[in-house]
Amino acid sequence: MSGPYTKIDLDKEEQDFQNQIKEIEEWWSQPRWAKTKRIYNAEDIAKRRSSLSSVPASNQQAQKLFKLLGEHAKNETASFTFGALDPIHITQMAKYLDTIYVSGWQCSSTASTSNEPSPDLADYPMDTVPNKVERLILRRQLFHDRKQREERLSVSKQERAKLPYTDFLRPIIADADTGHGGITAIIKLTKMFIERGAAGIHIEDQAPGTKKCGHMAGKVLVPVQEHINRLVAIRTSADLFQSDLIAVARTDSEAATLLTSTIDKRDHYFVIGATNPDIPDLIDVLTEAELQGKYGAELSQLEADWSKKAGLKLYHEAVFEAIDKSSSVKDKQAAKDKFSAKVGPLTGTSHKEAAKLAKEILGEEVFFDWEAPKVREGYYRYQGGTECAIMRARAYSPYADLVWMESKVPDYQEAVDFAKGVKTFTQTNWLAYNLSPSFNWNKAMSPDEQETYIKRLGKLGYNWQFITLAVLHTTALAVDNFSRDYQKIGMKAYGQQVQAKEIEDGIEIVKHQKWSGAEYIDGLLKLTTGGLSSTAAMGAGVTEDQFKDH
């Protein structure tokens, strides 16, 4: 065939294709993937990869994280960390903590690529958090690793034994929010995270357009299967780009109150409906009131009045109430037990099936309308809770490495219940826990309980725990205190409360020129000029010589 095409060796093309399929199958047969479910095969991935492909550098970090979490799970301990904002944070964190977190909340408030701050609504450009990851790992973690490596390998092995060593390449887990769009957006976002250096990402089951911080009200969930599709998209993207990326499935269902759709029967048990057949739909009441010129507080009062009359309940509550009132059902507890045996939070029974069973038990239908209470944005009312979170976590677990229930308070018993509910279903999944600064820790528990909380959670299987906004608060506290004292006592505040404390605690940033890499860059300069440079930054006369004894 002639024409404006490139000649290709078909036999080699086919051989390369088959070899890649075999390589993928061998990859997937490793213990790493023992608990991972895929809905596609190796051929599906191989045919969609580029002819020019390579394993990303971040894959080493993903493998490192997987091994680390496995060790913590075996030892019933936890990797506990907090969200980093700046390279200064990661260099100090790396000395003590074995993972790093990158928070979407912190990025939203301080690092949006739109340069417009916002609360945690995930309304920033989708490259915001990946860019923060790149700034922290590709541009900073690697730099400090190179700097340390040059310093250590410039002396003998015996001398290196006396030098402190820090693993600056701590694996990063980053916040993917709800994925910033549909399936293709999630595939692209995952690729961004892999390319920028993330070892893992977490994604939550809220609706993207109404996403809220896990500790805000008004959270809207997507159906169970829709979030599973997101998790599959993450793994598909990671497979396409040859990454062992760790996937964390978060559910916000413990405190959620709304649902986008009733398409998934696993959600039906938790959908709220009206049990009063004599009231109009809420949206009709509100629309009519708006046409009459009512707004604001008047509409809120109308909705509250409507809700009181509607008899809002879950379907099983309506059935139990009907059983209690029924004169034809003699053994009421037996009737309830019969219904509960097939209709429960974890049975996945559809509303249609539940209604059929209720009619069989009662001899008549139980009125229940989940369309009537829909809110003006079109969402269904939903009653979440721990059981709901367990149901969702179980559904997500085959497609994720860790599952995480966002919670309202640091309730240890709730953590026990969730862990038991998930572990009963799957022994293989690790759990994650948000040690949120949104909690009032001093109201929630005593200082002694605070000290042991991480360890107690670790024994339950919460092998990765994190404080989302610790550096936001610690930075504010430190700068506020220093500013206050600086205003009062001038340079004494810096000399005594900062510099002297840095020296006392051995914090290397007291020599900030060295910390920033001045000696390392001098070495590169001398390397390219034959070992001599009159413009070396750390040469004779450098001010930092004043700290040579520290």
From Swiss-Prot:
Q: Does the keyword Transmembrane helix apply?
A: no
Q: List, from the UniProt record, the residues annotated as the active site of this protein.
A: 213
Q: Which InterPro entries match?
A: ICL/PEPM (IPR039556), Isocitrate_lyase (IPR006254), Isocitrate_lyase_ph_CS (IPR018523), Pyrv/PenolPyrv_kinase-like_dom (IPR015813), Pyrv_kinase-like_dom_sf (IPR040442)
Q: Which UniProt keywords apply?
A: Glyoxylate bypass, Glyoxysome, Lyase, Magnesium, Metal-binding, Peroxisome, Tricarboxylic acid cycle
Its lineage opens with: Eukaryota, Fungi, Dikarya, Ascomycota, Saccharomycotina
Cofactor requirements of the protein = Mg(2+)
Determine if Lyase is one of this entry's keywords. Answer: yes
Free-text function comment from the UniProt entry: Catalyzes the formation of succinate and glyoxylate from isocitrate, a key step of the glyoxylate cycle, which operates as an anaplerotic route for replenishing the tricarboxylic acid cycle. Required for growth on ethanol or acetate, but dispensable when fermentable carbon sources are available. Also acts on 2-methylisocitrate.
Task: Please list the GO terms describing molecular function.
Answer: isocitrate lyase activity; metal ion binding; methylisocitrate lyase activity
The UniProt record lists the EC number as 4.1.3.1, 4.1.3.30
Q: In which pathway does it act?
A: Carbohydrate metabolism; glyoxylate cycle; (S)-malate from isocitrate: step 1/2
Q: How does it assemble?
A: Homotetramer.
Which reaction does this enzyme catalyse, per its entry?
D-threo-isocitrate = glyoxylate + succinate; (2S,3R)-3-hydroxybutane-1,2,3-tricarboxylate = pyruvate + succinate
State its location(s).
Glyoxysome
Q: Which family is it part of?
A: Belongs to the isocitrate lyase/PEP mutase superfamily. Isocitrate lyase family.
One cellular component term from this protein's GO annotations in UniProt: glyoxysome
Instruction: Report the principal subcellular site.
Output: other
Residues that hold substrate according to the record: 103-105, 214-215, 250, 434-438, 468
Q: What class of enzyme is it?
A: lyase
Q: Which GO terms describe its biological process?
A: glyoxylate cycle; tricarboxylic acid cycle
* Listed PANTHER family: BIFUNCTIONAL GLYOXYLATE CYCLE PROTEIN (PTHR21631:SF3), ISOCITRATE LYASE/MALATE SYNTHASE (PTHR21631)
Its recorded name reads Isocitrate lyase
